Amino acid sequence: MNYPNGKPYSKNKPLDGRKSSPFSSNIEYGGRGMTLEKDIEQSNTFYLKSGIAVIHKKPTPVQIVNVHYPKRSKAVINEAYFRTPSTTDYNGVYNGYYIDFEAKETKNKTSFPLNNIHAHQVEHMKNTYHQKGIVFLMIRFKSLDEVYLLPYSKFEKYWQRYINNIKKSITVEEIRKNGYHIPYQYQPRLNYLKAVDKLILDESEDRV
């Protein structure tokens, strides 16, 4: 069977030689050029409409520099700058749990550079984690088309290693070992809450 563009149909194959993740669906769709932010946005919309979770992207803080008032009842912003976010990208509620996470992409094939993370964001994640929030990083390796959930509890040691000038990145092998693979699928595109379910179970045992 051929598609309208003339290309033959073929079943999807695994991205690599890894065994199937317990969170995998039967179909892997891949990123297909979309950014991680768009994939998360689509997934969060699906969760909201399905009554599964309420998770939103936090607005980026803006510093207004110059405002013009052409009319007394109207203001026009002429100049403004995006400020460095003081917390993480996303937060919300899922099944009674507070969810808080940062999402990052990298073109690097072998590691995730930690200079992509700000110290005040890590401090926020630490404080939220100690209040029993579910805190993690979602990392996409663009060239590998792989997405992982890395819990804050696992990330913390790599951050300490970074600030102690021991190593400036987390290898993809370390992330695969300590994180949860999030496969692409149809709906939602990134069903990351299945990985969150596993994280909740694992951390409930660790925190006892």
From Swiss-Prot:
Superkingdom to which the source organism belongs: Bacteria
Protein name (database record): Holliday junction resolvase RecU
Annotated localization: Cytoplasm
HAMAP family in UniProt: RecU
Lineage: Bacteria, Bacillati, Bacillota, Bacilli, Bacillales
GO MF: endonuclease activity; magnesium ion binding; nucleic acid binding
GO cellular component terms, A-Z: cytoplasm
Keyword rRNA-binding: no
GO BP annotations, alphabetical order: chromosome segregation; DNA recombination; DNA repair
Cofactor(s) this protein requires: Mg(2+)
Residues flagged as site, Transition state stabilizer: K104
Catalyzed chemical reaction(s): Endonucleolytic cleavage at a junction such as a reciprocal single-stranded crossover between two homologous DNA duplexes (Holliday junction)
Enzyme Commission number, as recorded: 3.1.21.10
Cofactor binding, note field: Binds 1 Mg(2+) ion per subunit.
Cited function: Endonuclease that resolves Holliday junction intermediates in genetic recombination. Cleaves mobile four-strand junctions by introducing symmetrical nicks in paired strands. Promotes annealing of linear ssDNA with homologous dsDNA. Required for DNA repair, homologous recombination and chromosome segregation.
CDD domains in the record: RecU-like (cd22354)
Family statement drawn from the similarity comment of this UniProt entry: Belongs to the RecU family.
